[in-house]
């Protein structure tokens, strides 16, 4: 027998079972709930490179003076090629407004206290921005990243002078060399 919705009795029972299973799974999820606006800790901007997603999350639990519990579900995350390099380097000028508009929104909604800009070693976007020679060894790479990270800090400070800014270069093992 079909219902007016085109579902037979067995299909209807399967839909009901799926709904019960979904409700059961939802009830097992952590009950932590936050408002869309409020007082949150930070905004992290970093690169799209999949090698650094877990390492970046782990780093966020190690920031001096901020416990992992304080950061869990308590920071905005903006990901773009090159991370903070993508937000300021002329090679990626068409992306700049998107990042700065997002920062404005998270400042307005989330009342963040700091911005954390992390670039990383062996970054393809950095190579595109700076040229292969500028990142051909660790010293050159550090100098190129440092220049963009300084520009990033200056731009954040100009737009939002009350925010603190942490910048660094993440190594492929997850260690971050703080810059600035």
Q: How would you describe each model-predicted region?
A:
Residues 1-20:
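N-terminal secretory signal peptides and thylakoid transit peptides that target proteins
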Residues 2-7, 35-41, 49-54, 97, ...:
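Catalytic cores of secreted/periplasmic or lumenal enzymes
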Residues 15-20, 34-93, 170-176:
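Short, conserved "active-site rim" segments that organize catalytic pockets and cofactor/ligand binding
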Residues 22-24:
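Bacterial N-terminal signal peptides
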Residues 69-141, 145:
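Short HxH-centered metal-ligating active-site micro-motif
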